[in-house]
Amino acid sequence: MRTYYIFSSGRLRRMDNTLALELETERRVVPVEDIDHIYCFSELDLNTRLLDFLAQKQICLHFFNYYGHYSGSFIPRESQLSGFLLVRQVEHYLDQAKRLELARTFVEGALHNIRRNLEKREYDDICSKLDEIREGIGKTASIEELMSLEAHARKAYYDTWEEITGWEFGSRSKRPPANALNALISFGNAMMYTVVLKEIYRTALNPTISYLHEPSERRYSLALDVAEIFKPVFVDRLIFRLINLNMLKETHFDTNVNFVYLTEGGRKVFVKEFEETLEKTILHRKLKRNIRYKSLVRLDLYKLIKHLLGEEKYSPMKVWW
Amino acid sequence: MNSDQVTELRKAHITGTMVAYYFICHRKLWLFAKGLNLENISGNADVIKGRILHETRFNRQNNKEVAFDTVKIDFLHYNGQVYVHEVKKSKKFEEAHTWQLKYYIYMLQEKGVNCSAGVIHYPSSMRREEVNFTPGDRELLMKALAGIQAVLSKPLPEKKAGRKMCSRCAYFDFCYI
Ligand code: SF4
């Protein structure tokens, strides 16, 4: 299954059993059978006939605005439903102890993967600081406490970014991103979110019920929970690589009066490499076969389901390479 | 089994697939019945092949697919008697498929339809197996239906089977991760 990225404006429509992207000067026809995500970074005209077709073919359509900010997704109607699992999901949210246990696991997984990024670069002092913070995870008594612990860890982590990348960073700024590095993180995190979301929709998990993030957040917050684990591995590593290999330069960013955003050229570089990251394979030690990076997300959702069923405690993906 | 129990079973929405899974793997049966159906999302080539096969095999035959209650039948053949047909991709789980078909026959009989036989088609090996429903089968089937209910009433799925067949199962990743 492939992901398509649309950077040019035009009309996307259904043409018999295929998709046609009609641009001013040409028409491109794409067979639908091997598409599973379409990312749209430009202005598109489309109609409900197209959406109906995409739903039928289980294709997600994600929209980003002119500045590369994530606007939202069209996700096909859920085909997987399990009242049984939903009840368990809610139960694990309502029971404070159960919720905290899961929330801690997400943070624990995220911090492990963050630490691995620093360990490779021999930031021993920050690594031991992260270890200290990690030890505190088990003692947290509330989600707020856990969140603030995580914020501490993230700050220590981000403090190394100027050195790792050689780019200005300051601190994490989201809405809007104040500099190129922040713009890159926001963009990468949004991409990761959509990938997790798509996988959640393929399972019977309900994406609105989450544990670390509040379900009341306007987004499908379970995707935010799970994305925490994968961001350090899929997004952060990619950012370091793109900058260190000089594949992304200052010229790939537009500095608006108030904020910075990735230009079309910059987005193209990023998504191409992101796509390659997702398709990379690695020998899975437990399943004893090669699996794609993106399948790691699906496997973590399986583990989460097993936890919710009460079969086996969830242990998040901890990067081993 | 008395008629009350039979009504009870109907309520439990036992499908033909569930009957087959009962004879294949109780864990698979439990997961499937709870809505944790992984068949649609697995990249497993066998599963996809099976689905495509199921969708296309009899397209050219002019017979309708008939469905009632929880039963789905590929087509019925009217030759004085009604025959249930099922298409399967391999003979690996022949016993399970046979019971699935017998369950359909039983459901038809319950509806007062004159049916006591069917055919399982294996187009990939160009074979067909006739299945006859005997009075003894009825008793065995009742036992199986009760067994299915027992599996489904458990709070947790059965432990994984740990057999060679797991490697080709759509639930493999789920069970072994
Ligand atoms: S992988 Fe094995 S244990 Fe799991 S459902 Fe399939 S057959 Fe059963």
Curated annotation (Swiss-Prot), chain A:
Keywords recorded for this protein, A-Z: Antiviral defense, DNA-binding, Endonuclease, Hydrolase, Magnesium, Manganese, Metal-binding, Nuclease
Record has Hydrolase as a keyword: yes
UniProt superkingdom: Bacteria
Binding site for Mn(2+): 150, 213, 228
InterPro entries recorded: CRISPR-assoc_Cas1, CRISPR-assoc_Cas1_C, CRISPR-assoc_Cas1_HMARI/TNEAP, CRISPR-assoc_Cas1_N
GO-annotated biological processes: defense response to virus; maintenance of CRISPR repeat elements
Entry cofactors: Mg(2+); Mn(2+)
Pfam families on file: Cas_Cas1
Catalytic activity, EC: 3.1.-.-
Keyword check for DNA-binding: yes
Top EC category: hydrolase
UniProt record similarity statement: Belongs to the CRISPR-associated endonuclease Cas1 family.
Matching HAMAP family: Cas1
Subunit structure: Homodimer, forms a heterotetramer with a Cas2 homodimer.
Designated name of the protein: CRISPR-associated endonuclease Cas1 2
Natural source organism: Moorella thermoacetica (strain ATCC 39073 / JCM 9320)
Lineage per the UniProt record: Bacteria, Bacillati, Bacillota, Clostridia, Moorellales
